[in-house]
Curated annotation (Swiss-Prot):
Belongs to the bacterial ribosomal protein bL33 family. Keywords: Ribonucleoprotein, Ribosomal protein. GO terms for molecular function: structural constituent of ribosome. This is Large ribosomal subunit protein bL33. PROSITE patterns: RIBOSOMAL_L33. GO terms for cellular component: cytosolic large ribosomal subunit. PANTHER family: 54S RIBOSOMAL PROTEIN L39, MITOCHONDRIAL, LARGE RIBOSOMAL SUBUNIT PROTEIN BL33M. It comes from the Bacteria. It comes from Erythrobacter litoralis (strain HTCC2594). One of its GO terms (biological process) is translation.
Length: 55
């Protein structure tokens, strides 16, 4: 079987709440770390989420 093209990553909140989203990315197309402004329900605001590895 072939190796899957996408890998699962964790988007961790920069507000240090411990909240995170899980998404997929293709590391061949996107080599840099992903950052998004998404909603953090713990602080009830949009904050920046940065990519981290899933352990």
């Amino acid at each position: 079987m072939a190796k899957p093209a996408t890998v699962k990553i964790k988007l961790v909140s920069t507000a240090d709440t411990g909240f995170y989203y899980v998404t997929k990315k293709n590391p061949r197309n996107i080599t840099e770390k992903m950052t998004f402004r998404k909603y953090d329900p713990v602080v009830r605001k949009h904050v920046e989420f940065k990519e981290a590895k899933i352990k």
